[in-house]
Amino acid sequence: MSSAGLPAKPVFLITIDTEGDNLWAHPRTITTENAKYLGRFQRLCERYGFKPTYLTDYEMAVSAEYCAFAHDVLKRHAGEVGMHLHAWNSPPILPLTDDDYAYCTYLIEYPEAVMREKVRVLTALLED
């Protein structure tokens, strides 16, 4: 640390949005096939000494393949997991439009109690 309390070297932060396949094409059924490719990226990061942060949405948090990957990364202290909440498809589901999957409603658009519950549900999944 420098005398100003700053790191002596520059800090490099890598974040990866880990979310369902083709999510922005507005699918009704969301798959997580892309989870199987995260190990390859993780190995690349480890080769260069990087510890990425995987920002995780609901679909990934309930994907067995992603969960096995994330548990391994965390167990080895090789990266971190954070929350990436897509409000329109994270429980509890409360429709705000005639097609929330097309409009991709934001968390701030929901009643406060629903926002709080969406955060609680995803936090609980990620902590497990």
Predicted feature locations:
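Catalytic alpha-helical scaffold of carbohydrate-active enzymes acting on polysaccharides/glycoconjugates
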Residues: M1-D128
